[in-house]
Amino acid sequence: MSLGPTLDRRHLLSAGAGVAGSLASSAVAAASPVQKPRPAFHDLRDADTRLLEQVGRTGPLNLAKAYEVMQRNNLQGLVLGDPLNVFHVTGSWPFLGRTRPFYPPTTLAILTRDSKQAPGLVTSKFLYYYTFADGVPSGAQRQVFLYTDGPENPADFYPDRKEVPLDAVEIRRRDRVNEALAKNAPPVGIAPAVIAAMKAMGLWRSGRIGFDRFEIQEMCAHAEFPGQLVSGHVAMGEIRLIKSPLEIEMMRRAAVANIDAIHAAAAQIAPGATYRDLRSLFYAEASRRGNMPSMMTVDRVSNELADGVIRDGQALMVDIVSHFQSYHGDYGRTIAIGEPTAGVKRCIKASAVCWTAMSELIRPGVKFSELLAAGKAALKKSGIPTVVTVATHSVGLMHHDQPLFEQYGVSLPIDLVLEENMTLSLECVATNDTGIGGSVHYEDIMLITRDGAVPIHKVPDAVIQV
């Protein structure tokens, strides 16, 4: 880890965090026949298991909101190939969607307005066996439609050599595949499977169907679909806005780990450390807590090719994003290395004024534009001579997760109206004032309630003091 040219032993990252400390600890552990310590963050395990079992059983989707959006948009159903949408509807993330994000979809989700129909999952027999079956409990609330890549002998698919008893993974995969095959015989190829699934779910008829990948449109057109195919992007964006109780739990879990990670990382830096060091520490701490790091801006610098050296007396804004099973935490604070300058203190106060004004206005029925206007008006009224950028956006399966208005192939922002169970980031950034000795950021995620809003996580102080 590069700690900058001016760093000496007195400025090493805090005890236990440096490379030397880690190596020394490992050497002692290897030499001493003592019991290994309880793994870090072991206490999260049971709670995470409960959450993920529920995701596998029902999927995270807010079904009530989905039915309402489809009804309002006159959609009989949605046929979806974007991996994010497949996960949202079914709870299963397409494995190839991570490793080959721009390839044609091999797995699709189908959702119908008929509440008697469970969501559908269309995928290959091999992929279901190799990936999905491990996260799908028996009796999961979905219909599975498999397809093969060519003629096959079922006996050759997973032969039992009977040399040793089948292990838990082998039994689970065999059971899940057999359950699916007992309900729907697999055709050869994805297109026949999608068409068969649409027919089985009552969607192969006149009416409007939303889709999110052009391959779906081509499949249906080739088979002479009798209805109308329309873009489903806006509908899915509207559905994702309003979180189910399970999604709110996932958001809270992600947000808490995200915040704890940056506070743990900040405690390990000192003058002479670099921006890259801080970013690496945050990524490591987020991963230790079960989150996957997404991005981090340090002192206005988001380009990971750039770097800088942290100095005594500096204040640096951090904007951090990581996710737990695709549900995102988004948090911003100011890290002060020693005593901040008067200019930085002024910006911190101004950001807090804006954030407070916006948070006090939040309730169902308020528009995004009204929140922004409240923040700007509060800053003007305060008379504090500084520049604060105020922003708000929905957070969920993406860092900015909200519908965009599609017109002539161009996506345009919508002035959204707040609804109960939205998760909203309130963001106040003072980075345009230069020559003040640093940069300032104040950002938290709010959960919209029936008559107001509450933070989805604890709200630490505006400054992380180092």
Where are these regions (language model features)?
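Active-site neighborhoods and metal-handling regions in enzymes and metal-associated proteins
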Residues: S2-V466
